Regions:
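Histidine/acidic residue-rich metal-binding segments in metalloenzymes
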Residues: 2-20, 27-93, 100-121, 132-146, ...
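Fold-independent oxyanion-binding glycine-rich loops
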Residues: 21-23, 52-54, 75, 87, ...
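A short glycine-threonine-serine/GTX helix/turn-capping micro-motif
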Residues: 126-131
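Active-site microenvironment of metallo-dependent hydrolases
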Residues: 132-148, 152-351
Length: 351
């Protein structure tokens, strides 16, 4: 556990801009002393405190901001973003792989003619394959402009506003006394990148392909880093196939079942309730699947189970030990045998 003392030491590092997203917002709002000490450590050194406050509104939002939190990237609607803007926050508009919040917020900005000087862009969990296919912040700019946002506003949100937010003086603009870190686009519609300059020197002409860099993790990982710490992190009790049997998810004696409904482009899910007969039919059709979360840190043997709608697994199973923000083993599948096999595979490969 990182303490306030640890954070004080880290904040002295010149490349540390501030305190990363304060996810434990209930503790901030409730005045938890240990949490507030971490925020105070950043504020005393005049470093920014990033927020993480999905759906926090009203008086709770005021308390959260009063503690010293200055940004939020969890807004999924314009209304939430505008309320946080009114409380003095910078809004980082997120367009990631799962959470795609840019369109509703930009449409709200345009409809209400909202000043954009305290808006910036972020991605927050974007897969490398998506970055390769669609780009990173330049994709945010492209999409915002396609929705009608003026190109100059979108470019400022991608550069100058973000620099202002994080106190990066001398960055984010092309002007005297500013670092000559420049991206040159072919146009301001699809924003295809022509070249990149760092400190005034061309470092990436259009002909360069980033994937040609042959440097691997082995060559850049510090020798002092313990590989064992990350390859020996799966601690689970043996899991029998029966743990994924249908009756574990749909016990006898129950006529209706709660179902998690996935929605594309957002982290928000729907709370659905289906009768047993409907669940059975949708499981056969592949519209529903089984979902389980296995505790993998302390050998507790705890397993959470649910029915999941909209994931698309109709035959087989998918398991992963990456699952923000607790990173237990998650498995979704159509049958016990495949779910058990997928979990065993994750355990065998040590995550």
């Amino acid at each position: 556990i990182i303490t306030a003392y640890d954070i004080e030491k880290l904040l002295d590092e010149p490349n540390v801009l501030g305190l990363g997203e304060m996810m434990n917002y209930p503790a901030v709002i409730g005045g938890d002393e240990a949490v507030l000490k971490k925020i105070s450590a950043a504020r005393e050194k005049k470093k920014i405190c990033d927020g993480h406050a999905p759906c926090v509104r009203g008086r709770e939002l005021q308390a959260y901001c009063a503690a010293g939190i200055r940004t939020d990237h969890e807004c999924a609607s314009y209304e939430e973003a505008f309320e946080k803007l009114q409380q003095g926050m910078y809004i980082l508009i997120r367009e990631g792989s799962s959470a795609q919040d840019l369109e509703p917020i930009v449409r709200g900005i345009l409809e209400h003619k909202t000043d954009t000087s305290r808006f910036a862009f972020c991605t927050d969990d974007k897969k490398m394959s998506d970055i390769l296919a669609n780009g990173h912040i330049n994709n945010n700019v492209r999409k915002a402009v396609s929705l009608g946002l003026p190109a100059e506003d979108a470019l400022c949100m991608a550069s100058f506003h973000a620099a202002q937010c994080y106190g990066l003086t001398g960055r984010g603009a092309i002007a005297p006394r500013y670092h000559a870190d420049i991206v040159v686009f072919d146009n301001v519609t699809d924003f295809s990148i022509n070249s990149v300059y760092k400190a005034g020197i061309a470092v990436a002409p259009a002909s360069d392909i980033a994937l040609q860099n042959s440097e691997t993790a082995e060559t850049v990982t510090p020798a002092s880093f313990s590989i064992k710490r990350i390859t020996d992190s799966i601690h689970v009790v043996p899991v029998p196939r029966s743990a994924f049997a249908a009756e574990q998810f749909m016990p006898s004696g129950s006529d209706n079942f709660h179902v998690i409904g996935m929605q594309r482009g957002t982290l928000f899910t729907q709370h659905l309730v289906f009768p047993r007969q409907e669940c059975t039919a949708q499981l056969k059709e592949g519209k529903l699947c089984y979902l389980a979360v296995l505790e993998r840190h302390k050998n507790t043997g705890n397993i959470g189970r649910a029915l999941l709608h909209g994931y698309g697994v109709s035959n087989g199973a998918i398991a992963s030990s990456i699952g923000h923000d607790s990173h237990n083993i998650i498995v979704a599948g159509s049958n016990a045998a495949d779910m058990h096999r997928a979990v065993e595979e994750v355990i065998d490969m040590k995550g």
